[in-house]
Amino acid sequence: MRRRVALSTAIALLVGAQLCVAAEVEVAGAGGGVVRRRSLHQPFFPIEWSPPPPMSGSEAVPPPPPAAAASATTGGGRSTTTVMNTVAIALSAGLVALAVASYSCCLLLRRRRREEEDDGDRAAKRAVGAAAAVAARVPSDVGSSSRQHRSPPPSSTASDAIYLDPLTTLVEVRQHEKSPDLRPLPLLKQPSPDLRPLPPLKRPESQPPPPPPSTPPLTTTGYSTDEEDQATYYTAPKTAMSSFSRSTSQHSTLEQTAMPPMAAPAPPQTNPPRPVRPPPPPPPPRQRLLRPLPAESPPPAALANLELTGSPVKPAVEDRGGENSGAARPPKPPHLKPLHWDKLRAISGRTTVWDQVKNSDTFRVDEEAMESLFLNSGGGGAGSSDPAARRGGSGKQERRLLDPKRLQNVAIMLKSLNVAADEVIGALVRGNPEDLGSEFYETLAKMAPTKEEELKLKGYSGDLSKIDPAERFLKDVLGVPFAFERVDAMLYRANFDNEVNYLRKSFGTLEAACEELRSSKLFLKLLDAVLKTGNRMNDGTNRGEARAFKLDTLLKLADIKSTDGRTTLLHFVVKEIIRSEGFDSDQSAVNPGSGSKEQFKRDGLKLLAGLSSELSNVKRAATLEMDTLSGNILRLEADLEKVKLVLQLKETCSDQGASENFFQAMVVFLRRAEAEIKNMKTAEENALRLVKETTEYFHGDATKEEPHPLRIFVVVDEFLLILDRVCRDVGRTPERVMMGSGKSFRVPAGTSLPPHRNENRRVLSSSDEDSSSS
């Protein structure tokens, strides 16, 4: 519609513009007398017009006449006609434009009126439909209208709500669209009517029987029609579909209200019952059915009342008590200590000894004696209600100064010592560690109390018989000045000699191991045999022609297998050493007998087996740890401060005369301990120096690569274990005769490998990982 109006206006303006242009042209033609009047469809210039020929230079162009002269030549009547024509043209153009605009406005108003009529019809249809829906819901919602709606006044009927005037409906709908009653109401979560709490009920004796179940009457607010008064409905609580309604008439409106929450049930009253009865309650839950119920069940309402007041359980208990009142319950026997045994199941169809025991009546148990002897104090017998009786009949109650767990540990350690407090006090006063021994002082040091426990024990001035024996022991020991400081000093003194002897022996073992390893001729011959064998195997490679090797190579000899896999390189070296030791290189090449061979073999094996006993200190040194030895010296030096602390406390001791022997013994021991610690440090330095020299003697400059200084002894110890096993294998293997050209011959002692060995000939190969050379 708007496009049509705009198009009409544009056409009117275009027509007006053309008329104005035509008027201007007409005026110009009338003023000059040259331009003729033309029609609207004619162009501005004629088609046959051609430009005039050019003028010659001799011809003079006359100047144009002045405007006054031109105007004077035209007559007065012609100017008047031109003005009138202009006015007429302008008036015609204005009328045309006005007509077009008026037509456009008429079209717009007509379109608007049609839209309003269509909107009114649709609104009337919606109102009629809403009224019909309300009229259809009236019978189902009238039962709950007392809580949610207001009934229409008596003058309004269902017909008024259905058949409505469209104009009236349109006006009312527009008025009610802004009403707050038509806004969506929030949905309230309300329980089902079957799960609503029941009102309080009364006791069965005062509660009359309930009436038969009936539908509750209809309750409304406001007015209702005669047809609604005659009907009775029961409506469930408000739902999402019934909670939203609209009013369609001024005479019949339903007000939407939410159901208020129900209050808690009031306590039971003795007032007469109200005429209106609630519906019967739902059946009792499973837990309620498990409870004891009376013999005759009351009505549902009375049952709910009895459940709330708790009265039905009491009569049931009283009735049962009356039934069992004649038979008294026997007293529960006291609990005795358990006997843990394995019970056997009865075997049918077989006679056992237990059948005879079961049928025998020769033995009867004295229950009173058993209860007096084997009563379980923790079980709590039937007659032992007194706490003192449950603890064994003693009414004396002990007082605890220490934590129960801590006290239990002290009691266990004190029981293991099995000494009295007087003996401990005497040993601490005299200062002689040999009286009780180092183990006693070590256990006593673990019993040392904390500062807080010490204050509690010293501050207790009550009856000593009311505290625990372990607490009494600690309290007696704490009577000695700085008692547990003395215990630490005595423990250090008792263990000092053992620690010093262990260190002295360990350092001596290291020195002896170094001497044995450097002076052993058999070990030197073994190294020579391994070096020559390795050079023969590595001949022609970059690992050949070695002059030395690390002792770690000895551990790899047993890993190199022969071609047939029956022997190893270490077995071969052992056999060669036995052969070289059994034959003399200066003897003639006479083939010895078989008896001499066996004797040579036994002598050689005996010689090699003696290498382990020859290097016994090396095996002991392999079990030592240099870090442990150094740590023991540092610990001895640090613990010596405990002795110095006890001597410093001498000035604070109140009874110095009684402890004079202790302090004198500690002073003498302190001087000796300082001297011994100094000697141990010197022995440690000497041992480390010898170990370093021995390692350099075998490894040269590779000593810096060793992870710890005593590794050389560990390597030799492992090799000796492997060598002993190989010697046992060789001793069990029969002697193999070396054959050459059908005869056996003797290899000189200076030769490492024989030129020919048909039976034991092998092709040995090794890799960089299996052997190393220097």
UniProtKB/Swiss-Prot annotation:
Q: Where is the composition biased (Low complexity)?
A: 68-78, 242-261
Q: Which domain of life is it from?
A: Eukaryota
**Location within or outside the cell:** Membrane
Signal peptide segment: 1-22
Chief location category: membrane
Identify the InterPro entries for this entry: FH2_Formin, FH2_Formin_sf, Formin-like_plant
Quick one: where's region Disordered?
51-78, 130-163, 176-338, 374-402, 740-774
- Gene Ontology CC terms, in alphabetical order: cytoskeleton; membrane
Keywords per UniProt: Membrane, Signal, Transmembrane, Transmembrane helix
Domain FH2 positions = 326-749
User: Which residue ranges does UniProt annotate as crossing the membrane?
Assistant: 89-109
Protein name from the UniProt record: Formin-like protein 13
Provenance organism: Oryza sativa subsp. japonica (Rice)
**Source taxonomy:** Eukaryota, Viridiplantae, Streptophyta, Embryophyta, Tracheophyta
